[in-house]
């Protein structure tokens, strides 16, 4: 089987039959045993692959059973990876399976461990873990098949170091945060009310930890937000004084409700000039709602319905009673869980009551569950399609024809559901894949940092004096040379664990356009242990040929004209990705069709003369799917 180092654009590709034969003898790693992971594991075993290692940190939840077909009700709370391997083994007993109930970021899953695999498949729903696997595969020079789905949409991306874009070549949109001022005082969207109910109201009643889960952003609070935070602290003190009365009688609930939905709303409405350009909030009456709630008939039985105000009141009262009983019988704080009916009822009812107060659209409990639990709707058919495409792309990788590799997108289009595009070359400005890897074999744990800096970096690799070395933290730079005479062992650099050091610095022999020492791309040094007989009397041996380290490229600065084109292109991408519009490409024009109106309601929009999207515009387009 050709290794990744042998793959090139000039290599004569294998036939499909030869590639399939290679695939059957491959050793692969599957990261994630969820919706896509279950489908992928089934495909791998039915394809007859030689050996599969599967890793997942999660346990099986009741909500997984409708789409993760390897699991049954009896498996709830058991490790996903272990159960998936055990269940799937019946598909093909000849395949060697090894499962890990573990975090892929653990030290034991280092670069050397990744190198044992011919292919890695990512089936994750976690951005941080995806980036970690992406980096490990780049360092190990192992092809990665990245995949993701959301609803009816999905994508498959092939990542090969030095040949294609990596996962981080196109920036991903960060998770949204909401200013505390908006959440506390001026909500305007249903999500604002959901965040308030989940991250403020619920913790104040049932948790001793007064910090939110990070959704309410007060780190960079301005003066107005600082006042809001102070007001929040005052109200928190008042609310804490009422916590002891929760669950004792309806009197306790009345005090809580009156404070949150009557007194606080009246106080907020009296803020000067706050409601000049928006409708003021309207407080709720406890006695009026109590009377109407008696007529409500189990509104929580149907989570698809939108409750009226009286029904939300009834659900909130009952959920607080249930949660109060649980809180008294448990020493631990209660926390929100999307699959915990009691906590979900509380958040849904509180969010809808607050939405009614501010004249905001109210939602069903099902919709609020998606928001509060950050749930991306999962569809089993989408997972199955994407898993099948992962296998076809994996076989293409083993064929060795890099020119035929495609990134594939599953999308709702008028004429087709699959859209393919050729893989792009790596982004030269990407901070993740723009590096050079050097393997350094060490036979003596007493080798000092001075040997690395003076002998290897400066003498052999021609770094200037401006060089820095980092492990988990900075261990050397020109202004911090205290560690030069310390050994690798003293500094926690363990060759047995394949420690990765990062070197940042300038070249002593190359100059930039201004005649200054030019900055190089990061050098990553993988420190491994080797036998002393192979080092010719030195405490180390350079095992790879990283003698040429390219210069770091700087992104070009955009002129005002370029910025306007970029803005137009990003708007074009937003039009493309909108669920309410369909974009039909016709040479230099786009016809934008509003899918909610007549098919004749079209806009004709000329493209910029250069119809290739700039890197930033392209990034935004891809980010909409890559964050799945």
Curated annotation (Swiss-Prot):
Keywords: ATP-binding, Ligase, Metal-binding, Nucleotide-binding, Phosphoprotein, Ubl conjugation pathway, Zinc. Zn(2+) binds at residues 166, 169, 430, 433. SUPFAM superfamilies: Activating enzymes of the ubiquitin-like proteins. The keyword Hydrolase does not apply. Residues 597-628 are annotated as: Disordered. It comes from the Eukaryota. CDD domains: Uba2_SUMO (cd01489). The modification Phosphoserine is found at residues 559, 563. The keyword Ligase applies. Pfam families: ThiF, UAE_UbL, UBA_E1_SCCH. One of its GO terms (biological process) is protein sumoylation. Pathway: Protein modification; protein sumoylation. GO terms for molecular function: ATP binding; ATP hydrolysis activity; metal ion binding; SUMO activating enzyme activity; SUMO conjugating enzyme activity. GO terms for cellular component: cytoplasm; nucleus; SUMO activating enzyme complex. InterPro entries: ThiF/MoeB/HesA, ThiF_NAD_FAD-bd, UAE_UbL_dom, Ub-E1_IAD_1, Ub_act_enz_dom_a_sf, Uba2, UBA_E1_SCCH, Ubiquitin-activating_enz. ATP binds at residues 32-59, 64-67, 80, 125-130. Heterodimer of uba2 and aos1. The complex binds pmt3. This is Ubiquitin-activating enzyme E1-like.
């Amino acid at each position: 089987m050709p290794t990744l180092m042998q793959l090139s654009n000039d290599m004569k590709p294998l036939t499909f039959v030869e590639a399939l034969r290679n695939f059957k003898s491959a050793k692969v790693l599957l990261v994630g045993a969820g919706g896509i992971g279950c489908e992928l594991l089934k495909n791998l075993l039915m394809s007859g692959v030689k050996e599969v290692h599967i890793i997942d940190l999660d346990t099986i939840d009741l909500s997984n059973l409708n789409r993760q077909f390897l699991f049954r009700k009896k498996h709830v709370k058991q490790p996903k990876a272990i159960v998936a391997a055990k269940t799937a083994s019946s598909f093909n007993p000849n395949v060697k399976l090894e499962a890990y109930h573990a975090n892929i970021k653990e030290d034991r899953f280092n670069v050397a461990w990744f190198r044992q695999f011919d292919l890695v498949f990512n089936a994750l729903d976690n951005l941080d873990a995806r980036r970690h696997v992406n980096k490990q595969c780049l360092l190990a020079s192992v092809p990665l098949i990245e995949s993701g789905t959301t609803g009816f949409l999905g994508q498959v991306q092939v990542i090969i170091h030095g040949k294609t874009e990596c996962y981080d070549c196109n920036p991903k949109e960060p998770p949204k945060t909401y200013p505390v001022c908006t959440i506390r005082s001026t909500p305007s969207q249903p999500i604002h009310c959901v965040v308030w109910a989940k991250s403020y109201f619920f913790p104040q009643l049932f948790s001793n930890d007064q910090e939110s889960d990070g959704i309410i952003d007060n780190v960079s609070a301005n003066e107005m937000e600082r006042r809001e935070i102070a007001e929040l602290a005052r109200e928190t003190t008042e609310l804490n004084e009422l916590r002891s009365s929760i669950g004792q009688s309806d009197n306790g609930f009345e005090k809580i409700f009156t404070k949150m939905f009557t007194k606080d709303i009246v106080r907020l409405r009296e803020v000067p000039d706050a409601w000049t350009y928006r409708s003021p909030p309207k407080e709720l009456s406890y006695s009026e709602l109590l009377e109407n709630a008696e007529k409500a008939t189990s509104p929580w039985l149907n989570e698809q319905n939108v409750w009226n105000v009286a029904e939300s009141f009834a659900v909130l009262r009952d959920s607080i009673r249930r949660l109060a009983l649980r809180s008294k019988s448990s020493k631990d704080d209660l926390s929100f869980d999307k699959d915990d009916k009691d906590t979900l009822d509380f958040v849904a009812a509180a969010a809808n009551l607050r939405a009614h107060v501010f004249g905001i659209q109210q939602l069903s409990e099902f919709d609020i569950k998606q928001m509060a639990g950050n749930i991306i709707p999962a569809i089993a058919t989408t997972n199955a399609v994407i898993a099948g495409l992962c296998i076809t792309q994996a076989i293409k990788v083993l064929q060795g024809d890099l020119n035929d590799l495609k990134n594939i997108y599953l999308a709702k289009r008028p004429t087709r559901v699959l859209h393919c595009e050729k893989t792009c070359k790596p982004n030269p400005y990407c901070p993740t894949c723009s590096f050079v890897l050097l393997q350094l074999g060490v036979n003596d744990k007493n080798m000092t940092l001075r040997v690395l800096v003076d002998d290897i970096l400066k003498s052999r690799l021609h770094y200037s004096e401006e060089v820095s070395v980092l492990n988990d933290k900075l261990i050397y730079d020109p202004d911090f040379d205290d560690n030069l005479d310390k050994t690798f062992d003293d500094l926690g650099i363990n060759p047995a664990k394949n420690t990765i050091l990062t070197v940042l610095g300038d070249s002593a022999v190359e100059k930039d356009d201004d005649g200054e020492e030019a900055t190089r791309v990061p050098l990553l040094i993988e420190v491994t242990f080797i036998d002393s007989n192979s080092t010719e009397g030195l405490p180390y041996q350079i095992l790879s040929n990283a003698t040429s380290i390219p210069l770091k490229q700087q992104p070009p600065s955009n002129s005002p004209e370029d910025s306007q084109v970029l803005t137009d292109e990003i708007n074009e991408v937003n039009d493309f990705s909108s669920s309410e519009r369909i974009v039909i490409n016709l040479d230099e024009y786009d016809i934008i069709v509003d899918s909610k109106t007549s098919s004749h309601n079209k806009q004709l929009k000329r493209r910029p003369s250069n119809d290739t999207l700039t890197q930033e515009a392209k990034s935004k387009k891809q980010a909409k799917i890559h964050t799945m």
